[in-house]
Amino acid sequence: MQEQYRPDLLEQEVQKYWQNNQTFKAVKDSSKEKYYCLSMFPYPSGRLHMGHVRNYTIADVVSRYQRMNGKNVLQPVGWDAFGLPAEGAAVKNKTAPAKWTYENIDYMKNQLKMLGFSYDWDREIATCKPEYYKWEQWFFTELYKKGLVYKKTSVVNWCPNDETVLANEQVHEGCCWRCDTPVEQKEIPQWFIKITDYAEQLLSGLDTLPEWPDMVKTMQRNWIGRSEGVEITFKIENSDETVAVYTTRPDTFYGVSYMAVAAGHPLAEKAAQNNAELARFIQECKNTKVAEAELATMEKKGMATGINAIHPITGKPVPVWVANFVLMHYGTGAVMAVPAHDQRDFEFATKYGLPIKQVIAPMNGEEIDLTKAAFTEHGKLVNSAEFDGLDFEAAFNGIADKLEKMGVGKRQVNYRLRDWGVSRQRYWGAPIPMLTLENGDVVPAPLQDLPIVLPEDVVMDGVKSPIKADPDWAKTSYNGQPALKETDTFDTFMESSWYYARYTSPQYHEGMLDSDEANYWLPVDQYIGGIEHATMHLLYFRFFHKLLRDAGLVSTDEPTKKLLCQGMVLADAFYYTSPTNERIWVSPTKVMLERDEKGRILKATDDEGHELVHAGMTKMSKSKNNGIDPQEMVEKYGADTVRLFMMFASPAEMTLEWQESGVEGAKRFLGRLWNLVFEYNKNPVKTAPNPTALSSAQKALRRDVHKTIAKVSDDIGRRQTFNTAIAAIMELMNKLTRAPLTDEQDRAVMGEALSAVVRMLYPITPHICFQLWKDLGNEDIIDFAPWVQADEAAMIDDEKLVVVQVNGKVRGKITVPADMAEEEIKRVALAEENVQKFLDGLNIVKVIYVPGKLLSFVAK
């Protein structure tokens, strides 16, 4: 064994062993319990960042722990390789997106290998490879045949100068990122998948996921947004036309004072034909893209159409307004406005002087002031004809019944969830496998024509997609007839919605999945990724699994049993202000700090002498230049040290503050472990400790070892509190470094302890533990060594500490044999000098004994 811990040499050797022996290759074995652990795969942006390292380290700890517990572990890796950043990088670097992507994959793959993750590299996937997206294209055509795919017009960002569609990220303050032309909203035909057909399943399925974070489930419930209400039909005055609205508050129906419709609603467009001012307002609304999240805070604007609807029950006219807060693609594109009982309606009515009629009163009879705000709570009805006095539920049902009997309303369950628009007018994505025939018919591409391959050797001009710019690419045939390929590509969430399933049979060429493999490995046992994916990826991922199930490809209802959402990685951010008043952000690696005795920053300067402002701990980002390069850290400290710090510095779900002093501490800890094994190995023993021959000090140390094993096993396996597991190992290590190695039983206890520590740390710091396991004389390889088990007998305390109180105050502590009787414990306590002092001259009137913990004397 080498005397010095040299991670730079050791880690390369261990990684070479793993690679040469395919140690982590996963093979289906029905005789073994499987465990599928998966991290959300990375976008190949060029370099790993610390957020990646944290995510993948957590997954690797879980994988290695489960492997030591005898499970057949699958931990695959791949690349979410399509996406807009590749197009921008290709234009900037005068290269093709494919070339940029594949170079990044090669680079990042080496970075992952440096960190020692136990991946089955034979299952590696890159979603931009035709052999992957072929099956995605095929599945889309199958969904089309089942009626789950359709095409309709939808709004996009349109640059009229470049005549191209822009992604949201390419719109800067309402203008095109390239030419600064004001962006318009344009309707174009796009493909959709009917996720709404699965809304109820997606909602109810959340109740079958007890090991998902409650926050993620709540976010999905809110996103799906199930509501029970009534769809009501209003007639238009002096017309045969009608307009439908949906409301969850039919109890407020008598308080409707106006109707608001979206700019794209047929009523609005009809009214605009003879009203130039209204036409201009409608165009302004259409050119302002509004995210649903902004509706609550944006300025409410509207204009009267001059059209009235007729209230179905009262027969009174209801003026129709065009309003910028009503979206055409949500609900019916029209809402009934009850300003007395909806705050948004109230603000609009107040602004434009529209009537505010109270129809709900508080149940307790209190007066409300409708000049200040709407009363939005449930209550009892007033000013509502025969429904006066009813509470919410009775009024809901009473008014719904009346509307249904009149033939102008129907009870309805609605969802906030909208169908998934999967068309993207970008180049770097999987081509959508639909063909347009000369007669205008649209048909799915047949399997024998798949994959429709995206050309990779292209020149990007930053304006048009190469497959849209090249008319020859789209030309094809269908049953001998000329046809045109679709030039839109799939939303990249398509690829990430089923990759986890393809990992079970990545080289399978006969179909999308080998169902035998898929049904052995699925569902995923542990999935790990950021909570920012809660309502997009994690919802599409669940939806796709149900589609795969209904196609007979998988047999389970949900894709993963357990979900862990790791916290962000933060780092100090520093800047100085340039002569032009611009903030120049400086990398923390170039900052010199002066701190006070409590570690607080007093002064920060960079290597050019600028005095810096400390902007605090913020998420690592390019914009603040505070990212820490994992590769630099691995080269400086070793992969095990980086992994140990990542797992120790914070609970997995919480934010982690990057502190290089903490990384240095992790390196010192591993050095101490190495030194301890080195010292022990000068005179090791082969025999296990003999419990009957141990001194009380040796028993106490052994008891600490086995209590630590029990705690660490629970912390890693059940609680997933990896930081507390490491803290317990560090506490044990402090005791081991102080323990003597004088006689054989000392060394036997130490040998058992070191064997346990090395196995407990192995999932976290596998390289050093791989070597130390061999150095401790083990002939097997630690990768498949069994997880260390706690010895129940060793954990039993021979002695117990009893706190002694007199009149409620602690006056002594006594250590007594664990089996000592209560009367004997009293006798020992009363012999204590300090206890005698506080009982002197008093009579004991009561004795309270809590077995093994507390003896309390009440004296007068």
Swiss-Prot record:
One GO term describing the cellular component: cytosol
Domain of life where this protein originates: Bacteria
Enzyme class: ligase
Pfam families linked: Anticodon_1 (PF08264), tRNA-synt_1 (PF00133), tRNA-synt_1_2 (PF13603), tRNA-synt_1g (PF09334)
Motif ('HIGH' region): 42-52
Cysteines paired by S-S bonds: none
GO molecular function: aminoacyl-tRNA deacylase activity; ATP binding; leucine-tRNA ligase activity
Residue span of motif 'KMSKS' region: 619-623
PROSITE patterns recorded: AA_TRNA_LIGASE_I
Alphabetical UniProt keywords: Aminoacyl-tRNA synthetase, ATP-binding, Cytoplasm, Ligase, Nucleotide-binding, Protein biosynthesis
Chief place of localization: cytoplasm
Subcellular location: Cytoplasm
One BP annotation, GO: leucyl-tRNA aminoacylation
Residues reported in the UniProt entry to bind ATP: 622
Catalytic activity field: tRNA(Leu) + L-leucine + ATP = L-leucyl-tRNA(Leu) + AMP + diphosphate
Listed InterPro entries: aa-tRNA-synth_I_CS (IPR001412), aa-tRNA-synth_Ia (IPR002300), Leu-tRNA-ligase (IPR002302), Leu_tRNA-synth_edit (IPR025709), M/V/L/I-tRNA-synth_anticd-bd (IPR013155), Methionyl/Leucyl_tRNA_Synth (IPR015413), Rossmann-like_a/b/a_fold (IPR014729), tRNAsynth_Ia_anticodon-bd (IPR009080)
EC code(s) of this entry: 6.1.1.4
Family, per entry: Belongs to the class-I aminoacyl-tRNA synthetase family.
Family annotation (HAMAP family): Leu_tRNA_synth_B (MF_00049_B)
UniProt name for this protein: Leucine--tRNA ligase
Organism: Mannheimia succiniciproducens (strain KCTC 0769BP / MBEL55E)
Gene: leuS
